[in-house]
Amino acid sequence: MKYDHQQIEAKWQKFWQDNQTYRSDDNFQKPKYYVLDMFPYPSGAGLHVGHVVGYTATDIIARYMRTKGYNVMHPMGWDSFGLPAEQYAIRTGTHPAESTQENINNYRRQLRALGFSYDWNRELATSDPNYYKWTQWIFTKLYEKGLAYEAEMLVNYCPALGTVLANEEIENGKTKDGGHPVERRPLKQWILKITAYADRLLQDLDLLDWPESLKKLQINWIGKSEGAYVQFIEKTTQEAFSVFTTRPDTLFGVSYLVLAPEHPLVSHITASSQQQAVRAYQAQIASKSDLDRTELNRDKTGVFTGAYAVNPVNHKEIPIWISDYVLMNVGTGAIMAVPAHDERDFEFAKTFKLPIIPVYDPVCEEITIRNQVLAGQQCWPGHGICVNSACGDLSLNGLNLDQAKKIVINWLEINHKGKSATTYKLRDWLFSRQRYWGEPFPLLKFEDGSVRLLDEDELPLCPPAITNYKPTGDGKGPLTQIKEWVEIIDTKTGKKAFRDTNIMPQWAGSCWYYLRFCDPHNTEKAFSPEKEKYWLPVDLYIGGVEHAVLHLLYARFWHKVLYDCGYVHTLEPFQTLRNQGLVVARSYQNKMRVYVEPRYVEQRDGKYFDSRTGEELTSQIDKMSKSKLNGESPDEIIQEYGADALRLYEMFMGPLEKEKVWNTDAVSGTRRFLNRFYEMAFSDKVTNETSEEGLKLGHRLVHSVMKDMELLQFNTAIAKMMEFINEFTKLVTYPKQVIQMATQVLAPFAPHLAEEVWEHLKCEGSLSFTPYPQVEEKYLQENVITYVVQINGKVRGRFDLPKDQTQENVLEAAKNNPHIQQYINKKEIGKVVFVPNKLLSIVLR
């Protein structure tokens, strides 16, 4: 009987949909498991196979946990507000709501075709008024707690997109979305005070089962620094200004000060002889982004103001410069430069021939380095013993860093010259966008400058229907053009009022969607306390690491605010998080750097050619993307090989968290495995009789795959299924009981085929909730030993063999093992040490 994947998959998808198999009930008596994907933005391109990795992983776990007795919630929704839909509307004239719904329908079709066990009754979209009503409501809570405020500030403005962007949305001076140039402009914006939660965002990372690398990204982004504020006095004007430093112990080594070009003090202190140069420099750097300005490898630039400040510890006069590497929104917008012990200061000092004063002796270093450091010829950012650091009643000479730091901070505080302090790199979150397709701000502004938050019964505030979505180009959004929407009479006060013409960023809706999934149809509340208490926290969250300092940081911030307001009971939203690795694929370009579709590419002698023109192409491995024409749609693969084969291949390519190179042809390998499984289950050899050997194979399979499932090691679990079928099909007859066990193990990975086999074996009910097989220890006991192989004293491999093998047999097995072979590599074996049932040690000549 042939394995007809199209017929089987259509049959079982209809069964699941008709029976609402995966609908999760709020059964508070049953242990819950909440498994969640980072929900997608529904783009016009649809899903590609790179997206499928994370969705397959969560589906495997959702299916597995149902068979372990858990009440599983596995929902799906759409992050449907945002710039891409609006850009599409500008190009085509299609309203974003219309194009977004079309894209959602396509995504839903693709996800259903993959057999994912989502609870579609909980489906939501952030652009649905029934959803964003509560996004706006949460904003009112932020405002009431003093965490939302308006301020004019220098912002990252993208002329091409016509909107302001947060630092997190920019990379190498360009927008992450589209790579458009960004400039700095002063604009009045809505800002969320995420910095008020900086310490808690850091501390509570310890509560989470997240990859350490991801935690480190958040730790570095928050950037907690402990040090001191030091007060300097400008000599002529006597104006005081503060500098934050993590190294107050180096104050005696300060040889110049640097202000951000935008610092308000610059215009007051600049000498008349330097005013023209300072203004020219300010104009020159005005359009540079923060990232451009702080790039470590770029040439150092700056201008002397002609002013001097007095060093509080030794009363020496220090020149004051301006330079673009100092940012007004970091620290105080001023730094003290110690070129002898800071690489960037050292480069700046060398460029402008400024003094270099060493105040640390690197006593443990070799004499040449030590002499160069003490002569000011080499920068030494490390520790040592303080030198050249005494004046009056303050002496740090002979002290180490910790001792010196403590004493100088104490001296600064006693003498009212400074104080200890903790600062953060994290900036408050720029929360407004000058676009149309997003949540309007739920408030009214009055002519006297006062603000009224909209009451809950006035929500949602929906954007007006418009036909022109283009940004105005003056930093204002398209809503400014709709006077009848902007200027109104407030029905509750009778006063003339103005609606805000900015909208919230795309991140707003994704900050809390995991909460709405708990209670998606509630019209009275964002979610009920009982359901939140039952379902939260999310037990497993899977998505890309690129969201580390965007969505994940923002969602944690909102959650903590809701916790403080008493709306949620957990300190954190996502207990366990895993990142899936990128799926990359070959892309091809012609000599004009135009990308060529893979279907037009042919390979000859290791080179690539355009089959239409014969032109040789360049090829590289790239992240899958529509622009590079290397994003493979799952639709064609499902048609040819089946959803189960695709799901298996997505997981078999490699460890979940690692980058993987896509190869469509390799899907045939997992399809062949499914063919074999199907043929085995439908074979005439299937018998109701059991066998010791068959039961051992079955129980070992269940035992080993369960361990892999707990660790999300899906590739090795699939490998074990393949090993199982190799051994099992060597049996004279196939015990039905063992096939049932193997089918249950396969089910989370290839659910359509597994259901078909289960039905054929005349087993009761759907596999979806059939308890996972119980392992019997007696079938795990086997006369099999794992031998450790050492080569020249280093462990080079392990393999299993039956117990009590001779040295000759174990040595022969080692020689034939591909992994161990590469270390022997035809070299002569000089000596062999054999410990029976444990170790084989080989010494090569």
Curated annotation (Swiss-Prot):
Record CDD domains: Anticodon_Ia_Leu_BEm, LeuRS_core
Enzyme class, broadest EC rank: ligase
Family note: Belongs to the class-I aminoacyl-tRNA synthetase family.
GO BP annotations listed: leucyl-tRNA aminoacylation
Record organism: Protochlamydia amoebophila (strain UWE25)
Protein name: Leucine--tRNA ligase
Motif 'KMSKS' region location, chain numbering: 623-627
Main localization, broad class: cytoplasm
